[in-house]
């Protein structure tokens, strides 16, 4: 039984619907999608198991372990903390990068910059400098995907550099 919600028969579907409703009431865009990602992170459930078990009661021990975390994550999202910061990660150029409140969240439009460098500068001996690297997504993507030999990432923020490492 989950002490927080007082129920022992809560299903995955009900849990997701409640999370989506809570975020929707807070005016969060894409509330259902965000509730899914938060539930996935809090409980470690994947889509296959969700669809197979969505109408079955969640095992009490699993509910007890994840419910509080899920509620905390929903509250943060309702307060408009970005989903990526709550989850601590963002995909960029096919890789997953750590993010928190100390760095900007990598965006798809920045991927165009990386793609352009990869396309227009095939020479691997270039010296590349990523100023204000934040999460390090640009520098790391160029080094990994482009095979550039000399990529330097710098930031004035020690907190940002810890994220980039």
Specify the residue positions occupied by each region the protein language model found.
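A short N-terminal interaction module
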Residues: 2, 6-57, 70
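Conserved SAM/SAH cofactor-binding pocket of Class I
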Residues: 108-165
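Conserved AdoMet
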Residues: 40-119
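A general structural signal for well-ordered alpha-helical segments in protein cores
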Residues: 16, 35, 70, 80-83, ...
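Conserved acidic
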Residues: 11, 62, 156
């Amino acid at each position: 039984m989950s002490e927080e919600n007082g129920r022992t028969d809560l299903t995955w579907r009900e849990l997701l619907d409640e999370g989506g409703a809570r975020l929707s009431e807070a005016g969060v865009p894409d509330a259902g999608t965000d509730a899914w990602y938060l539930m996935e992170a809090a409980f470690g459930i994947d889509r296959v198991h969700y669809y197979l078990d969505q109408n079955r009661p969640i095992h009490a021990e699993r509910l007890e372990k994840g419910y509080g975390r899920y509620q905390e994550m929903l509250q943060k999202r309702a307060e408009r903390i970005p989903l990526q910061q709550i989850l601590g990660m963002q995909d960029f150029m096919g890789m997953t990068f750590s993010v928190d409140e100390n760095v900007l969240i990598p965006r798809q439009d920045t991927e165009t910059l990386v793609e352009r460098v990869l396309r227009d500068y095939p020479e691997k001996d270039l010296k590349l400098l990523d100023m204000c690297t934040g999460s390090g997504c640009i520098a790391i993507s160029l080094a990994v995907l482009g095979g550039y030999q000399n990529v330097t990432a710098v930031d004035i923020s020690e907190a940002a550099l810890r994220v980039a490492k």
